[in-house]
Amino acid sequence: MPRITLTNVTKQWGKFIGVNDLTLDIEDKSFVTLLGSSGCGKTTTLRMIAGLETPTKGEIRFDDKIMFSSEKNINVPAAKREVGFLFQNYALWPHMTVTQNIAFGLETLKWKKADISARVAEMLKTMKIEQFAQRYPAELSGGQQQRVAIARTLAPKPRVLFMDEPLSNLDAKLRGEMRTELKRLHKDMGSTFVYVTHDQLEAMTLSTKICLMNEGVLQQYAPPLEVYNRPANLFVADFVGNPAMNIVEAKAKKISPNVADIEIFGHHAVFQANDDFDMKSEKISLGIRPEFLPISDRGDLEGQAYSTLPAGMETTVKIKIADEILSSVVFGAIDYETDAKIRFSVAGNGILMFDRVSGLLIANGRVVFEN
């Protein structure tokens, strides 16, 4: 399976820039998710890698082989890139059985009949759809059709599998099941998967790395937990996480290589960073995940219950303090009366400090309030 390298890839239509100077290294056998909201450039990026869209400039390589180069005037057609596609629309032939749908691409590639039969049987078993071999697409559920589409795409043994929002047509339960299947399939197949979604849950649970984009610009390219715990900037911090990260404006004054005095919620506190850091401005924003706002009678801060959103296993509690509405997540079903007093703390060493002007991450650490 190839290592895919994009170097300074740009796609422009007139004055509109869809993807701007993107450099990306997709490692062999990785599962990379292109994540972002509609119009961010993620699907355009996938289509350029696959050969369905021609970049305006830049270079794309599969291992050492150039697939596209604006300087060298090279553009290898999609059909010769040995890739597979799985889209939101399964595009199964309605007049063909499951077996015939899976075999169709192999027949087009002039595989021998014996090899086709063996490969179809292998894919039916891999995708756990052997019992549906002689059924037609109309006789299958959405999840079953999805499995057939995956089997058909993987049958020719593509070097890379491209998936564009493949689970968006499924209900929530089926999406969860298919996430499990896709992750297992990636491990078993040993292929390189490139996956497009706007759903952060899919990106977090499936990926070896997330490529988060906004307005055609790469914001962060890192493993899911790094994106979650150390977002590169305020956009990433706000985009990833449900409930969303609390972003609170504050003022800070550095007093030692890894410590700053801060004013937050009308209180004085100290930010103790895990490492030395540099500050260019006193204007900062603190990023606090909801799980780092534990509710306790012995909490350092007092606020009011703004709303309570129980969801069974956990409850999101909205807390009003000063001019801020904060989200806290607590385990179990808890209900607070509106405007009831709540004591809580800012806990853990995963509190993030951002430069409010540039939006870039400065440091992570802990916040200690003065008594």
Protein language model features and the residues they cover:
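ABC ATPase nucleotide-binding domain
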Residues: 5, 25, 61, 343-345
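The feature captures the beta-strand-to-loop junction immediately N-terminal to the Walker
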Residues: 35-37
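ABC ATPase nucleotide-binding domain helices that frame the ATP-binding cleft
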Residues: 43-46, 148
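Helix-to-loop junction immediately C-terminal to a conserved catalytic motif
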Residues: 50
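Conserved ABC transporter NBD signature motif
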Residues: 58-70
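ABC ATPase nucleotide-binding domains
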Residues: 81-84, 88, 92-235
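Non-catalytic connector elements of ABC transporters
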Residues: 243-248, 254-371
